[in-house]
Amino acid sequence: MQIQQAFDQIIETGKKRIGLLGFSFKAGTDDLRESPIVILAEQLLGKGLKLCIYDKNVSLARLVGANKEYIEKQIPHLSSLLCTTIDEVIDQSEVIVVGNQTPEFAEAILKATPEQIVIDLVRLPMYGSLLKADYRGICW
């Protein structure tokens, strides 16, 4: 993923409330050490943006070893940024960033409104005309 390009696209929206769907480096894992989304989140926080992060596989209580040490160093206040549901991310965000190909994300972004922007970093399978939000991709 082009982290800088994703960062630039998000900043260019001028929006302040950013939702991240998917935080681990790939769907179905809780490993954050190889995740470019962690780096992106750090950059967005550095710009003072408000983040709401959802990844059903990432739970601070379950993180152990090197994975736990890594995230505590990179984003020590992660617990305050985690949302418990996808709907919470959709409801609270002006920009919704899709960071991995978890199957439920393709359906979830259909709930986004015309006022919201969806930035898809992974090229989800789409439902085309059903999507109401401003849909943007990266590198495809």
Model-found features: residue ranges?
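Structural/interface elements that position substrates and couple domains in central-metabolism enzymes
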Residues: M1-W140
